[in-house]
Amino acid sequence: MKAKHIVKIEIKCQSADEMLKAKSAVLYHLETLNPEFQANENVLTVTVPTLDSKLFYPDEACKIIHDTLAQSLTFVHEWTCTLHNIN
């Protein structure tokens, strides 16, 4: 089954140490979803493919990911979690 959507997480970090801590938090919760990381200056961008299935619609998957990370990224000043269509 091919992913039709991705969840994109953008985390604005204030230091390299904070970026490492954020990456560790994301990996801890989402490692089985094969997240891809890209760092650009002070922003850590994470993309996670979502599979369309009868169990979770993509917008539900995005909300679950957001709610899960919200508990771990409390130390980060600003971050977003959005759903994108890749068709």
Region roles according to the model:
Residues 75-87:
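Glycine-rich beta-strand-turn "strand-cap" elements at beta-sheet edges
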Residues 19-28, 65:
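A short, charged, amphipathic alpha-helix used as a generic interaction element across diverse proteins
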Residues 25-28, 36, 84:
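Mature extracytoplasmic or otherwise solvent-exposed domains
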Residues 2-6, 41-43, 76:
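A general secondary-structure signal for short beta-strands and their flanking turns/coil
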Residues 32-71:
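Short, intrinsically disordered low-complexity segments
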Residues 1-22:
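Short, extreme N-terminal segment that most often corresponds to the first beta-strand
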Residues 10-14, 47-51, 84:
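A structural detector for beta-sheet-dominated domains
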